[in-house]
């Protein structure tokens, strides 16, 4: 009922500001019950006792009813009466609450559009397709038959006012646009909002839902141009790839594309006609692969750059798009170095008394976890040195022994599960070695002992049961399928279809 009420209000007037004065908006933002299709971490609308406080929400709404304080906050960002002192608790608390509620409201038209599109097409919801690892089987199936790959980054930097203009299509009331600019004024010392994934991560620490929505709306507009070119250049629609893109919420984007095709534009689209082009994106990085010639992929690059520059009114760096031939190129995507390998294979063909040797080539998508980048991430998190030597974690020494073990085991399990698709398993062994010894050093430091003395006292089986759980489960899986011993199991690549979010240590690129 609440969802229908919000949707009707938004469709009738497209006014956002009145919804900010409703208490249930902030409850939805906190309890993460607005839409199960959107993966956000719960918002911290808490008081001093670390519990959800409806009283604080009511106080905030009462202050928002006082238009004088809100107007003065928009006109004078230096003396902000609404947020209070910028270093105070009330300032951060009020800013976070309003921005997260604002993000919930802005998701209404996009979420309702996605749900209606799914219902109209009657496409089943597959939980497996929401996994990040589901991209790699797709690449294994498609990239082996393609010739060129274009490794591109979503254009940035972008001026903050362009984001306001993008949302102006959905938001009609002026106070909401002023409130949006007010949030941007909090970060006036930054030149751009979307500069890198690190910047987005910094923003998401305080306002996860709001800034991730802004980032997704900007990427929406960037992909709008690509989908427009793709739809106009070829009228063939791929059902398999359409179902695959369910995880990235592209149904609403594909369904509501504006069909604008002028006569002068048809000549350009004819040169871009390619029925074997595939597009995959995660966050700010995308892969554009084609079976066509080098000239065709260069035309795609040329027109994408020009359309982006004309649409967003800023210069797009062409060097951010790298075009390479697939058999001779290794591209970085989702924490892996991927490349197409050609393996020569000799097949003996026996026909009656004659035998023939046939030389053939087999292609295979090889994925390798970059050990240098992973060690660099572990070094930044203070688990090891730059050279990969394990060190203790002093900040965790105030925790209990069980909590320290849980922290290390969780990080080790997440990293090893995510990089289980690597063909080089030595990287996983290196990760386990670093985290295991770092855990032992941390516990020894807490108990003011040496690692050797601590390990001798607890026995050689210390930590083994925590780190071998994954290997035991994998052994059971493979023993059910192959009747012979696990020869070459260390080379098997495994993709998990339940990973919906990249760990901070994994997102090292």
UniProtKB/Swiss-Prot annotation:
It holds the Pfam family Intron_maturas2. GO terms for cellular component: chloroplast. It comes from the Eukaryota. Keywords: Chloroplast, mRNA processing, Plastid, RNA-binding, tRNA processing. InterPro entries: Domain_X (IPR024937), Maturase_MatK (IPR002866), Maturase_MatK_N (IPR024942). GO terms for biological process: mRNA processing; tRNA processing. It is found in: Plastid, Chloroplast. One of its GO terms (molecular function) is RNA binding. Belongs to the intron maturase 2 family. MatK subfamily. Usually encoded in the trnK tRNA gene intron. Probably assists in splicing its own and other chloroplast group II introns. This is Maturase K. The gene is matK.
């Amino acid at each position: 009922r609440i969802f229908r009420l919000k949707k009707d209000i938004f469709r009738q007037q497209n006014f956002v500001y009145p919804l900010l004065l409703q208490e249930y908006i902030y409850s939805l933002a906190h309890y993460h019950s607005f839409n199960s299709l959107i993966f956000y971490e719960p918002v911290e609308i808490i008081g001093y006792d670390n519990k959800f406080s409806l009283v604080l929400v009511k106080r905030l709404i009462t202050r928002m009813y006082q238009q004088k304080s809100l107007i003065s906050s928009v006109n004078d960002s230096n003396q902000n009466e609404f947020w209070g002192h910028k270093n105070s608790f009330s300032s951060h608390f009020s800013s976070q609450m309003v921005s997260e509620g604002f993000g919930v409201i802005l998701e209404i038209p996009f979420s309702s559009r996605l749900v209606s599109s799914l219902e109209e097409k009657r496409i089943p919801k597959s939980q497996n397709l929401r996994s990040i690892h589901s991209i790699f089987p797709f690449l294994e199936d498609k990239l082996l038959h393609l010739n060129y790959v274009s490794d591109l980054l979503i254009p940035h930097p972008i001026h903050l006012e362009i984001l306001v203009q993008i949302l102006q299509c959905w938001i009609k009331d002026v106070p909401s646009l002023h409130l949006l600019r007010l949030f941007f004024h909090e970060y006036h010392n930054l030149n751009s909002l979307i500069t890198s994934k690190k910047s987005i991560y910094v923003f998401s620490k305080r306002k996860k839902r709001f800034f991730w929505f802004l980032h997704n709306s900007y990427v929406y507009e960037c992909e709008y141009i690509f989908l427009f070119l793709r739809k106009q250049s070829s009228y063939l629609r791929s059902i398999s790839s359409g179902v695959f893109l369910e995880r990235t919420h592209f149904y609403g984007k594909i369904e509501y594309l504006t069909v604008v095709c002028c006569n002068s534009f048809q000549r350009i689209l004819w040169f871009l006609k390619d029925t074997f082009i595939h597009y995959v994106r995660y966050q700010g990085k995308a892969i554009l692969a084609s079976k066509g010639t080098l000239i065709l992929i260069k035309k795609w690059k040329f027109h994408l750059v020009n359309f982006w520059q004309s649409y967003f009114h800023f210069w797009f760096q062409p060097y951010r798009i790298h075009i390479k031939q697939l058999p001779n190129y290794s591209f970085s995507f989702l924490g892996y170095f991927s490349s197409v390998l050609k393996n020569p294979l000799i097949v003996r063909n026996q026909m009656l008394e004659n035998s023939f040797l046939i030389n053939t080539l087999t292609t295979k998508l090889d994925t390798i976890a970059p050990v240098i980048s992973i060690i660099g991430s572990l070094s930044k998190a203070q688990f090891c040195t730059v050279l990969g030597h394990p060190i203790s974690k002093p900040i965790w020494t105030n925790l209990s022994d069980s909590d320290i073990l849980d922290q290390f085991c969780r990080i080790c399990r997440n990293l090893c599960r995510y990089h289980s698709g690597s063909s080089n398993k030595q990287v996983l062994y290196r990760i386990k070695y670093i985290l295991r010894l770092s855990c032992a050093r941390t516990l020894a430091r807490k108990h003011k002992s040496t690692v050797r003395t601590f390990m001798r006292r607890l026995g050689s089986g210390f930590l083994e049961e925590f780190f071998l759980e994954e290997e035991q489960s994998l052994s059971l899986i493979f023993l059910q399928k192959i009747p012979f011993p696990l020869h070459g199991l260390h080379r098997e690549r495994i993709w998990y279809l339940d990973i919906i979010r990249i760990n901070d240590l994994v997102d090292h690129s």
